[in-house]
């Protein structure tokens, strides 16, 4: 146990952690020199250059005449996946804090760092990409020292591209990170920090043993779900899974026990023996709650069952995705899906498209609201269609977040304007270094769901970084905004919005739909309504034939008769005609500026 070191890598998106991890693996001869990131398996991970799932890999390293086992647990850096990060951090004793020498400290770096400090991890700061022409190692070192309170000589300068500093990192891991502590005699207690789905073997859980020993064939149970299994195969994770007869305290490994559904394996759960269970679970387990909800509908109605099967398969690998069936008058049958955030939603959509060849329509994303009726009962509503009658509602509460934005001082003005427009309240701001500032806001989650991140990036020329945590619910004046076409509500376009924004949003939606819905043989009235009150209207004029073209001179009553006849025909057509809303209209309404 003395020769085991468990560590993870903390970094903001795109600060080069996966590339640096490759260099560590090559240096310890765990892998041959290869192309591309070893730890990012999914094509999507490689393409977007982000790490979505956590991964683990074991390296062997000789130092001072002794052999050490180093377990690297890779973590995602993106805000949507922060729960996966927290579980990975809990399985470690130390962390490499990687900061890009050309970009400096970013918002996600700080939030993940605080998480690591809460778990009392030993932090080794690493300055990456020092070989770049745009690197400013001295300035960024000062930022790290302000943040961590460490010394200059504690910071290792490295480059994932050239391999500089890799040996120093490995030495620091052995010297500075403490070995795992635990009692091999105690009952088994192991923390699950990830699970993957394998189509032949079922769900494979990755765990780290805190106390005790696990042997092949043991009967084990998972603490929070209470389910019992046989440990058919256990082992360690190198580039492939290597079976072992037993794993001891401090080891990181995997267990295969023929589990079929991902719901049974919850990240953060505790594994223990049935015969001799541990007293209590490892602290810090929480159910991951989806934050953003959207309707997902197949474009062809007959693909409904295929969509269900595809979502179920995705859920095997991605336990944070939730879905339940719902139907819409405009779009037919589909599912209400819950996601961790917007990036997660985009990734699920792309994976449906790529891995299952499913084309889907997604409705306006929204968050879940707490609706209190006059009797004081609370209902959680994920869908504007599920809102009770306004006369029965006492008040509505919506989820708020604590947002942290780090940006260059030049962009403070426009960013503050953006946050105020999204009903943000400034909590505080402080300067990280001479020209970078950290701004804290309290904001409603519903406002940032649609396009906040994109706007923030474009205002700040891509330099601002953003991170958020949920901070509970607050009462809000929310109303349900309906869009009517010729007096018929289109349920897929309904949204919940704040009273102050309702008029503006309704007007913009009507104008946008007017551009996108094709003209018909009759007038189409597009209206935005709150309850029975119409707040905005646009009319798409009918296409009409010039029926009086054949009249030369003659009496005006002849023309009038023809025009009246046309009018009657249009009126009859309007009663039986219906308006098709094209798919691009649904998408454009999502991206209103």
Curated annotation (Swiss-Prot):
Catalysis: reaction(s): GTP + H2O = GDP + phosphate + H(+)
Query: What's the protein's topology in the membrane?
Result: Peripheral membrane protein
EC number, UniProt record: 3.6.5.n1
**SUPFAM superfamilies documented for this protein:** EF-G C-terminal domain-like (SSF54980), P-loop containing nucleoside triphosphate hydrolases (SSF52540)
For the biological process aspect of GO, one term held by this record is: positive regulation of translation
Gene Ontology cellular component annotations, sorted alphabetically: plasma membrane
List, in alphabetical order, the Gene Ontology terms for molecular function in this entry.
GTP binding; GTPase activity; ribosome binding; translation elongation factor activity
List the subcellular locations: Cell inner membrane
Domain tr-type G, first and last residues per copy: 2-181
Q: Which key words are in the record?
A: Cell inner membrane, Cell membrane, GTP-binding, Hydrolase, Membrane, Nucleotide-binding, Protein biosynthesis
Into which EC class is this enzyme placed? hydrolase
Query: What CDD domains is this protein classified in?
Result: EF4_II (cd03699), EF4_III (cd16260), LepA (cd01890), lepA_C (cd03709)
What's a Pfam family in this record?
EFG_C
Primary location group? membrane
Question: PROSITE patterns given for it?
Answer: G_TR_2
Q: Where does GTP bind?
A: 14-19, 128-131
PANTHER family registered for this protein in UniProt: TRANSLATION FACTOR GUF1 HOMOLOG, CHLOROPLASTIC, TRANSLATION FACTOR GUF1-RELATED
**NCBIfam families, per the entry:** lepA (TIGR01393), small_GTP (TIGR00231)
Role this protein plays: Required for accurate and efficient protein synthesis under certain stress conditions. May act as a fidelity factor of the translation reaction, by catalyzing a one-codon backward translocation of tRNAs on improperly translocated ribosomes. Back-translocation proceeds from a post-translocation (POST) complex to a pre-translocation (PRE) complex, thus giving elongation factor G a second chance to translocate the tRNAs correctly. Binds to ribosomes in a GTP-dependent manner.
Q: Which family does it belong to?
A: Belongs to the TRAFAC class translation factor GTPase superfamily. Classic translation factor GTPase family. LepA subfamily.
Write the protein's name.
Answer: Elongation factor 4
- Organism field: Phocaeicola vulgatus (strain ATCC 8482 / DSM 1447 / JCM 5826 / CCUG 4940 / NBRC 14291 / NCTC 11154) (Bacteroides vulgatus)
Q: What is the lineage of its organism?
A: Bacteria, Pseudomonadati, Bacteroidota, Bacteroidia, Bacteroidales
Q: Which gene encodes it?
A: lepA
């Amino acid at each position: 146990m003395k020769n085991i070191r468990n560590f993870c890598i903390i970094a903001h998106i795109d600060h080069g952690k996966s590339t640096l991890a490759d260099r560590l693996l090559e240096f310890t001869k765990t892998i041959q020199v290869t192309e591309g990131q070893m730890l990012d398996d999914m094509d999507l991970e490689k393409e977007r250059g982000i790490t979505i799932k956590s991964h683990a890999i074991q390296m062997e390293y000789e130092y001072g005449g002794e052999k050490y086992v180093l377990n690297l647990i890779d973590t995602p850096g993106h805000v949507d996946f922060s729960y996966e990060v927290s579980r990975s951090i809990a399985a470690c004793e130390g962390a490499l804090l990687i900061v890009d020498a050309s970009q400096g400290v970013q918002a996600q770096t700080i939030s993940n760092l605080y998480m690591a400090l809460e778990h009392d991890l030993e932090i080794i700061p690493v300055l990456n990409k020092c070989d770049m022409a745009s690197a400013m190692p001295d300035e960024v070192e000062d930022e790290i020292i302000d943040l961590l309170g460490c010394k200059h000589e504690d910071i290792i300068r490295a480059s994932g591209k050239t391999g500089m500093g890799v040996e120093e990192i490995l030495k620091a891991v052995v010297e500075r990170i403490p070995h795992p502590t635990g009692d091999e005699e105690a009952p088994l207690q192991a923390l699950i920090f990830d699970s993957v789905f394998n189509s032949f073997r079922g769900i494979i859980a990755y765990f780290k043993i805190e106390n005790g020993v696990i042997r092949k064939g043991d009967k084990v149970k998972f603490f929070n779900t209470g389910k019992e299994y046989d440990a058919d195969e256990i082992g360690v994770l190198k580039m492939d899974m290597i079976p072992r007869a037993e794993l001891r305290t401090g080891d990181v490994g995997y267990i295969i026990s023929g589990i079929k559904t991902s719901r049974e394996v919850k990240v953060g759960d505790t594994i223990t023996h049935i015969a001799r269970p541990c007293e209590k679970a490892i602290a810090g387990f929480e159910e991951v709650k989806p934050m953003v909800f959207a309707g997902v509908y197949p474009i062809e109605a007959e693909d409904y069952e295929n969509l269900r099967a595809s979502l179920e398969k995705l859920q095997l690998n991605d336990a944070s995705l939730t879905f339940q069936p719902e139907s819409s008058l405009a779009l037919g049958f589909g599912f209400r899906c819950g996601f961790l955030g917007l990036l997660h939603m985009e990734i699920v959509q792309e994976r449906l498209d790529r891995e299952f060849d499913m084309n889907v329509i997604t409705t306006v994303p929204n968050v879940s609201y707490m609706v209190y009726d006059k009797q004081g009962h609370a209902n959680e509503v994920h869908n504007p269609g599920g809102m009770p009658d306004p006369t029965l509602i006492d008040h509505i509460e919506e989820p708020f977040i604590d947002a942290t934005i780090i940006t260059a001082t030049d962009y403070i003005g426009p960013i503050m304007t953006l946050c105020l427009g999204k009903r943000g309240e400034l909590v505080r701001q402080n300067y990280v270094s001479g020209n970078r500032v950290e701004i804290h806001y309290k904001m409603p989650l519903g406002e940032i769901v649609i396009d906040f991140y994109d706007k923030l990036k474009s205002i700040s020329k891509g330099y601002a970084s953003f991170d958020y945590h949920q901070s509970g619910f607050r009462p809000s004046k929310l109303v349900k905004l309906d869009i009517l076409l010729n007096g018929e509500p289109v349920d897929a376009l309904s949204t919940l919005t704040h009273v102050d924004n309702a008029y503006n949003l309704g007007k913009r939606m009507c104008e946008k739909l007017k551009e996108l819905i094709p003209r018909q043989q009759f007038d189409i009235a597009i209206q935005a309504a709150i309850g029975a009150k119409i707040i905005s209207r646009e009319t798409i004029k009918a296409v009409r034939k010039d029926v009086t073209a054949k009249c030369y001179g003659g009496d005006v009553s002849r023309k009038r008769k023809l025009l009246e006849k046309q009018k009657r025909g249009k009126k009859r057509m309007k009663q039986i005609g219906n308006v098709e809303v094209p798919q691009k209209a649904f998408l454009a309404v999502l991206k209103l500026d």
